[in-house]
């Protein structure tokens, strides 16, 4: 294996684990530290102008938080990378709508880095992600055949 291939694999590992950690703690904080009710309270006022009721907002934020928590863990360990990235991309669309109701979209300093990490990881080929459970399981399936 060439040095460049290891560098690619390590770069993907770094991006995948950092992205996983970011989303994991984002979901964890909303679920266990800040609590969903407080997050709903924060967004209820700005979203009231769109006539979005808290009864819709609460399960939406809870689902978003669970997606961030679970997909963050999966990205961190490298299991189900693509499906996790798809769920997180959909989650970011929801987050973009919620946050853009509060302030201008271009002022969302935390949104765009996460979006960029997801897009870059989606461009990475699975066979380049050497240090992941997906790769390990795929290798063991191929060896067993």
Name each model-derived stretch:
Residues 1-38, 52-66, 70, 77-145:
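Extended, low-polarity transmembrane helix blocks
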Residues 44-47:
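Juxtamembrane inter-helical linkers in multi-pass membrane proteins
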């Amino acid at each position: 294996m060439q040095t460049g291939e290891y560098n690619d694999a390590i770069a993907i590992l770094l991006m995948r684990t950092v992205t996983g950690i970011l989303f994991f703690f984002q979901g964890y904080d909303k679920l266990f530290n800040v609590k969903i009710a407080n997050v709903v309270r924060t967004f209820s006022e700005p979203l009231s102008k769109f006539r979005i009721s808290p009864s819709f907002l609460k399960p939406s934020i809870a689902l978003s938080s669970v997606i961030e928590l679970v997909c963050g863990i999966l990205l961190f360990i490298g299991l189900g990378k693509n499906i996790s990235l798809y769920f997180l991309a959909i989650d970011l669309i929801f987050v973009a709508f919620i946050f853009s109701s509060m302030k201008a979209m271009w002022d969302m300093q935390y949104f765009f880095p996460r979006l960029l990490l997801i897009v870059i990881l989606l461009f990475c080929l699975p066979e380049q992600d050497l240090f992941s459970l997906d790769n390990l399981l795929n290798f063991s399936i191929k060896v067993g055949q």
